[in-house]
Amino acid sequence: MNEQWLEHLPLKDIKEISPVSGGDVNEAYRVETDTDTFFLLVQRGRKESFYAAEIAGLNEFERAGITAPRVIASGEVNGDAYLVMTYLEEGASGSQRQLGQLVAQLHSQQQEEGKFGFSLPYEGGDISFDNHWQDDWCTIFVDKRLDHLKDELLNRGLWDANDIKVYDKVRRQIVAELEKHQSKPSLLHGDLWGGNYMFLQDGRPALFDPAPLYGDREFDIGITTVFGGFTSEFYDAYNKHYPLAKGASYRLEFYRLYLLMVHLLKFGEMYRDSVAHSMDKILQDTTS
């Protein structure tokens, strides 16, 4: 990290800066000053607005009493966007039961006007999504997310006409199921995989790196099931505090498909079979 670049940050008396691994979108650093330790994210060649949605999400988490990093500052230096947050010290272990309770607490926050979406778009390193407010979840999830992913996969040569035929069948099935399901606009993390939570040194769970959205809470829960990191204690505690509706086990596959399509777009052919398997499951399984 260039010292001249660091001089533009609103942090005084920086003693040490060291890279932090784990993400695939941002450069991440631990920054120590004379008085405190901070977490710095940098997105090269992007405007300050790149972090606007994440900042808004973290602020909503704070208002909801969700343990998460607190925003300190954001801005732009030499054409690079940055975000400074409090640094959360990770502990050795924690309670999956408490994590389930925390996510249930997050999802209990409802959009006051009953709208689905968010005040800002999702901006990722490889794709962006329109979050304009909608009256129904299906428009946000299917029209704005899945259809956009389908178009991008086709445009980038990762899907062909045969894939689109299968997708169109899957799409009809998803729409039919969501029209029967009563969705409520809960505050979502938006990217709740195992790498976006941690246990602090006192054992408390914390959430970070949100892609905020008001939507059906099954979206978050479905994403938790793709790559692991969540135990049966997590799901038992979540369902005890905020039980999922009948048929959730089938609908969760919709959100697994979404995440796998995102990964196919980001990482290529290695996820092609996983996406195909997920679409087959949606077509073959029945609501339980």
Curated annotation (Swiss-Prot):
The active site is at D191 (proton acceptor). Its EC number is 2.7.1.-. Keywords: ATP-binding, Kinase, Nucleotide-binding, Transferase. GO terms for molecular function: ATP binding; kinase activity; phosphotransferase activity, alcohol group as acceptor; protein-ribulosamine 3-kinase activity. It is an enzyme of class 2 (transferase). ATP binds at T86, Y87, L88. It catalyses: N(6)-(D-ribulosyl)-L-lysine + ATP = N(6)-(3-O-phospho-D-ribulosyl)-L-lysine + ADP + H(+); N(6)-(D-erythrulosyl)-L-lysine + ATP = N(6)-(3-O-phospho-D-erythrulosyl)-L-lysine + ADP + H(+); N(6)-D-ribulosyl-L-lysyl-[protein] + ATP = N(6)-(3-O-phospho-D-ribulosyl)-L-lysyl-[protein] + ADP + H(+); N(6)-(D-erythrulosyl)-L-lysyl-[protein] + ATP = N(6)-(3-O-phospho-D-erythrulosyl)-L-lysyl-[protein] + ADP + H(+). The keyword DNA-binding does not apply. Ketoamine kinase that phosphorylates ketoamines, such as erythruloselysine and ribuloselysine, on the third carbon of the sugar moiety to generate ketoamine 3-phosphate. Has higher activity on free lysine (erythruloselysine and ribuloselysine), than on ribuloselysine and erythruloselysine residues on glycated proteins. Belongs to the fructosamine kinase family. PANTHER family: FRUCTOSAMINE 3 KINASE-RELATED PROTEIN, PROTEIN-RIBULOSAMINE 3-KINASE. This is Probable ketoamine kinase SAOUHSC_02908. It comes from Staphylococcus aureus (strain NCTC 8325 / PS 47).
